[in-house]
């Protein structure tokens, strides 16, 4: 059997665009003599549509598309993902009509029949994720819901499709995304299909990429192989590519559509560099596979490019503050890689505290990237603000409030530049700064997009190296990239906000990077978990132990002082994070609508206080 795998760049909310793309690939697959063409989950309107799924007029458009696609199946079997609804009189949990995340299967203008002749041409997603940025149960009922309400056994709900072409019958199992990741659910669609002895399983997905996601999927495939042994069947995994967003998180899809043999080995693979592709594979042949390097760099570039194309359709200039620090240097390079230097304008807005070397770095970076660049001083604005505050009986103007004035004035200027240039602002914050509130509201928290908002500082350092490798030039000044050995970091020029004399960022780079990930990555941990690890001495076995020793945190008093500062900073910054721009998500825990936060103060409960006292007494 020849299968065309269509790794589609799905444009959320753009039904006509997606249908046109599908039709082109179907026509080409017919010319290539494919028997079946497979598209990703929710490929007609997008997967991350939020409450657009609740609008009847939009749902009506999606439903009409199913009949259109079915009419295209005269010469080829078509499998695609979209919404469907049944049992309209019963109603969903929210009182609206039922909606199902569905895999459709049509051939010769008809629905492909199932072995039990029930719900021909339709398979409902059974495992609905409700963790992280997934919220499936808000919008859909599951195949399990349908089976229970209609008194149908799961083996009949999860039933093989009988595809007959050229006098050859193939028994195919269809799944939708999470059905493959069924370990924590009450149903295992893969196991049921194996029991049905299907010829192979096709899993259609819109699975967002995060770091090492491909390794997690390979692990899950191997788990299925271990469970079923020789009974396991080949599996065709078809994923989306490109970018979709939920408002607060910009998610990238790497594609990486793969055909797995029954023993879990890879038979064939499409690109995993986030780009659209469509190829025809013969299940009886083997193909070369490949792995994309610098995947994080690729992900950020694609996120910016697709966000610009899909969301900012008026093609604005991208306005960026270039301080000469590593975050803004990396971001301006990412913008140029994604959009071209002609779409980017850089501004250096110095005060008396900005050193000549950082101003020179900003200038040189812009020059090497051929970016339109302007430099000026904010001193007059700072002085005018001081004078105004004095009129309101605030004198002297100093301390943190004075530092924030500088940051907010820069935000004000960037907003003005963007207004006059018809542009949007690129946010320069990284994940650690966002976690600890090391940013000024309405100052450096503004922007249309935060490319680095889910990247730790150590990841930003690695991105800087990758960018220099990409350009084969020192785009990011080497003095900004520290020398890092195990548990030791040496800067040519240490990170600084440059809002006062001799200022250095207060973060313990390496350790705090790890701690942010530890507290936010799904499934997340809390301070009590970490205190118990420290108290038991198990921290010495963690990957962060060398950093803790480097910063003197093997001393219990220093450790407690630091963790209390960390947690208080974390909680006091929640109100800032809520107002942060959309973040490009690249980890298993991103601020926004991934790791969801309520505004709650840092409070040490009785158990936490007791454990802290035990640690301070040296009873570890």
Describe these PLM feature segments.
Residues 170, 231-233, 287-324, 328-620:
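ATP/NTP-dependent adenylation/nucleotidyl-transfer catalytic domains that generate, transfer
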């Amino acid at each position: 059997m020849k299968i065309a795998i269509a790794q589609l760049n799905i444009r959320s909310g753009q039904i006509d665009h997606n249908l046109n793309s599908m039709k082109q690939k179907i026509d080409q697959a017919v010319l290539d003599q494919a028997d079946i063409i497979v598209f990703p989950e929710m490929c007609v309107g997008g997967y991350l549509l939020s409450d657009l799924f609740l609008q009847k007029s939009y749902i009506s458009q999606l439903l009409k598309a199913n009949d259109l696609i079915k009419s295209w199946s005269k010469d080829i079997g078509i499998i695609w993902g979209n919404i469907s609804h049944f049992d309209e009189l019963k109603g969903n949990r929210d009182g609206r009509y039922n909606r199902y995340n569905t895999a459709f299967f049509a051939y010769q203008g008809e629905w492909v029949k199932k072995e039990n002749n029930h719900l021909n041409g339709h398979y409902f997603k059974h495992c609905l994720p409700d963790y992280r940025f997934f919220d499936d149960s808000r919008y859909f009922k599951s195949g399990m819901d349908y089976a229970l309400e209609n008194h149908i056994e799961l083996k009949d709900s999860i039933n093989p499709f009988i595809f007959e072409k050229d006098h050859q019958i193939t028994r195919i199992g269809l799944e939708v995304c999470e059905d493959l990741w069924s370990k924590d659910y009450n149903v295992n669609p893969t196991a049921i299909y194996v029991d049905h002895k299907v010829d192979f399983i096709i899993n259609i997905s819109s699975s967002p990429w995060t770091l090492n996601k491909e390794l997690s999927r390979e692990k899950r495939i191997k788990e299925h192989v271990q469970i079923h042994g020789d009974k396991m069947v080949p599996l065709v995994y078809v994923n989306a590519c490109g970018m979709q967003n939920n408002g607060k998180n910009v998610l990238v899809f790497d594609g990486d559509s793969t055909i797995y043999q029954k023993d879990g080995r890879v038979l064939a693979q499409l690109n995993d560099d986030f780009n659209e592709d469509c190829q025809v594979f013969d299940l009886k042949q083997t193909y070369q596979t490949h792995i994309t390097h610098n995947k994080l760099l690729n992900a950020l570039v694609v996120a910016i490019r697709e966000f610009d194309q899909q969301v900012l359709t008026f093609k604005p200039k991208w306005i960026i503050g270039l301080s000469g620090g590593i975050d803004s240097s990396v971001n301006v390079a990412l913008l140029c890689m994604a959009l071209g230097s002609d779409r980017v304008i850089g501004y250096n807005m110095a005060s008396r505290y900005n050193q000549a070397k950082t101003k020179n770095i900003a200038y040189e970076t812009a020059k090497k990237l051929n970016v339109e660049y302007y430099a000026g001083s904010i001193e007059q604005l700072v002085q005018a603000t001081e004078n105004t505050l004095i009129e309101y009986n605030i004198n002297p103007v100093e301390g943190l409030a004075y530092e924030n004035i500088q940051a907010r004035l820069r935000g004000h200027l960037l907003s003005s530049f963007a207004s006059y240039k018809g542009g949007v602002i690129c946010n320069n914050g990284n994940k650690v700064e966002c976690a600890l509130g090391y940013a000024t509201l309405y100052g450096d928290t503004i922007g249309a997009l935060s490319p680095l908002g889910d990247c730790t500082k150590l990841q930003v350092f690695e991105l800087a190296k990758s960018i220099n490798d990409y350009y084969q030039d020192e785009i990011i000044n080497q003095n900004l990239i520290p020398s890092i050995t195990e548990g030791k970091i040496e800067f040519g020029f240490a990170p600084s906000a440059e809002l006062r004399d001799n200022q250095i960022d207060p973060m313990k780079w390496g350790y705090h990077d790890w701690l942010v990930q530890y507290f936010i990555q799904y499934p997340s941990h809390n301070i009590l978990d970490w205190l118990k690890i420290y108290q038991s001495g198990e921290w010495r076995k963690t990957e962060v132990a060398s950093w803790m020793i480097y910063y003197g945190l093997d001393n219990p008093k220093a450790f407690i002082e630091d963790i209390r500062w960390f947690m208080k900073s974390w909680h006091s910054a929640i109100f800032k994070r809520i107002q942060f721009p959309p973040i490009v998500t690249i980890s298993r825990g991103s601020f926004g609508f991934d790791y969801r936060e309520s505004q709650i103060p840092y409070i040490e409960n009785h158990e936490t206080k007791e454990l802290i006292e035990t640690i301070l007494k040296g009873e570890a």
